[in-house]
């Protein structure tokens, strides 16, 4: 969102609320290419389906990594054709519960709700209800261990860990739960449906042609981290969060909420291939699917079912299945970054008084912030507090050190305004004052040569000793931006911070934005 911070879409930060019945038009400069998605930043409206894909095609002069996949001219031409017809796959976790009701009920019970009804692909999917026998066949050692914490407990009919187990997993400091305030349909009441299935149809006109397809896998997820695979087909991962990477050849891609990956697939045999999406969060067995229908004119399509690479809980079906390792991603044509940052910010995540209130810097962002007049319309150069970072103006490099001090789930960190470089991560505390000190103590934990460029990346899960993640980002894009965990219940619970970047050179907000009322 370069040079148009007023179109960043965060109420109370960069714009006013868009009330029901109102119309608001965003105008912005598309200076980047790749896969993105628009979504609500008000309350939990993203849980109610307020999201959609944005795919920006690269200029013809943009260097692409296709030559690292093949040097064959015919194949390269087919890949270029696939790029022009690339298709978004919007992957979502879905509840049959209105988000406001779900949030208030979780506040009243003190129990975070990790259960969903289905996985959707481009808005299509179905509810799958497993029998006790099917659950037993799929239960992972970790889920079995967690159930053992409460003797006699078992998965609910939604294949969720029961509330009695979920509360044990709550971070330290949470008050006792009120189980009687949990609506019965949150964890139970699975009703199988015969919903629609997304079918992608690809037709090759001649047997002598060559067909590649490009998919933008978009994690428009509320909570789930998922594994995505295409039966019998190998994927070339060519971009992460809109940025080209050195191609990774895999059979399954892990996607957290907010992340996007672009993949290339070559099709040679006419079949209907299953796309499999499996949630890998411990609290629930959740899965969905879509179909890729490939036909060649004049040839008979195979009717044999395709063989899966992963099962319903995201485990590999054979030892040869290769999973994407997000830590191993390297940029295509890496940028040069400075050896040290100009500014360092250290932040600690924790639960603030109740399990649904998550703090980013030991302080939650006030939950009514979205109702305020946008800070962008009146930035405060001297504002520095536990939920506001004000960086110096100019071409300043800033390190953000995310500290997770105890048992917590991964937090997919997302920063508006500029992508960031993932420098390193680790287990235990981060006792050093900055990255230079940490490098001197443990140089192998950091990459300043060719770090990946992302806009969403998870902290490591916090164990008994905690964990940390280090991100480096330029603050040269004038604006008031949001930094937040992309887990929806966490951002709604206050796990966000405000970043003021280069506000001394902030352009004047257009009148159609500053004077807009509804």
Regions found by a protein language model. Name each.
Residues 225-227, 407-412:
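A short beta-turn/strand-edge loop motif at beta-sheet boundaries
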Residues 1-31, 60-75, 185-206, 235-268, ...:
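Extracytoplasmic beta-sandwich strand-turn segments characteristic of Greek-key/jelly-roll folds
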